[in-house]
Amino acid sequence: MDINEIMKILPHRFPFLMVDRIVEMEPGKRCVGLKNVTINEPFFQGHFPGHPVMPGVLIVEAMAQVAGIMAYLASDDETRKKVSYFMAIDNAKFRKPVFPGDQLRIEVETIFSRRGIWSVAGKAYVDGVLATEAELKATFAEKAK
């Protein structure tokens, strides 16, 4: 799935769109996305000058966006009219810094999906090395007016 297809699903736009491509998909079960991290990312201006490091919370956000795509594709037409909202982040661990030039491989796997709540395990890798992991919960709700 390319960026144009991703933008039809996710409401996020620059500078907060954190997924460039979906490379593997089992709707409702598992999804793998890529994020190419470049020095042009606006967050590098302040995190940190002279030593740019991608903020860990944005890596977790990238996981949430990949999970959102997976959940959307597994949902019915009525749910697809809604927007997904974060509910919880548990057991987040930041194991390796992510730098400009890195490519994040973001893997999410469903733990459960019940009563409109999705729980997923997310992992982000750089060159096959685990950089970040977390468990995320989200739900779909009506768009704010």
From Swiss-Prot:
Its main location: cytoplasm. Gene3D superfamilies: Hotdog Thioesterase. The active site is at 47. It is found in: Cytoplasm. One of its GO terms (molecular function) is (3R)-hydroxyacyl-[acyl-carrier-protein] dehydratase activity. GO terms for cellular component: cytoplasm; membrane. This is 3-hydroxyacyl-[acyl-carrier-protein] dehydratase FabZ. It comes from Geotalea uraniireducens (strain Rf4) (Geobacter uraniireducens). The gene is fabZ.
